[in-house]
Amino acid sequence: MAAIADGVADAEHIHQARVSLRRLRSALHHFATWSDELNPVWEEQIAELFRKLGDTRDEDAIRTEILPMIVQHGSPELLLPISEQPLKDLTTLFKSAETVKLVLALLAFAYSEEDNQNAKGKLKKQIEKSLDKLHHQVISHADHFTELEVTEQHKIRKKAKQLRYCIEFISSLYPRKNVQQFLKKLQPVQNTLGLYNDLFIAEDLFNKATEHDPHFWFALGWIKAKQPYLQNQSAEALQKFKQAKIFW
C-alpha cells in the first residue's frame, strides 16, 4: 500500500494490496462478534478501497496463465488489450486523509488490549462457531456442485478462500501439523475453483477482444470447451475435501 501511495506501484504491488484487503475483509466479517471495539464502518471502507484497485490483476492472470495454455493448443499468438488503471488516481486515494485515518484506526485496534478478562476462555468457542459456519458453506453443495448456477459456484470459491484466510489468522492457537494438513486438503479446491473462475473472466475479456482480433474466436471456443471439464474437477475436489477431518 505504501508503494501505491508513493506512486511507484507495479502489478505485483496492486496484487498484494488486493490480497491484504481481502484478508482484512474476511477477518472483519467473520470475526465481527469477537470484540465490541470493531467499527462496522471499517469493512465497507476496506471494500471500497478494494473496488478502486480494479481488476488489473485478473487480467494479468489471464495473460500469464490462460493465454499460454490456449497457444499451446494451436492458437496463434494472442495479445490482450491493456486496460490502464490510472496510478495517479490510486496514489491520491491511498494518500487521502480518509485512508490514512482508516489505517491508523486499524493499527490502534490491533495493538489494543481486550478489557474482557474472560476473552481468552471464550476464544476457542468463537473460533469453532465461525469456522464451522464457513466450512459448512464450502462443503454443503459438494454433491450437487455441477447443478448450481455459475454465480453460486463462484460464491463457494470465495468461501473457500475466506476459510483459508480465517484459518491462517488463528493458526497459532492450534498444532501446526494439524493446521497444515487441513490447508493442504483445501488447496486443490482453491486451485480448481480458481482456474474455473478464470475461464469465465477470460470468456468475458475474449468476447470483447474479438472486435479487434478474430483469432480470439479460437480462444473463446477453447474456453467454452474447457469449462465443463473444470466444473467436474471442482466438484471432485469439493467431494474429497468434504471428507477432511477438521482440526478445531
Segments the model singles out, each with a brief description of its role:
Residues 1-248:
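Function-determining surface determinants
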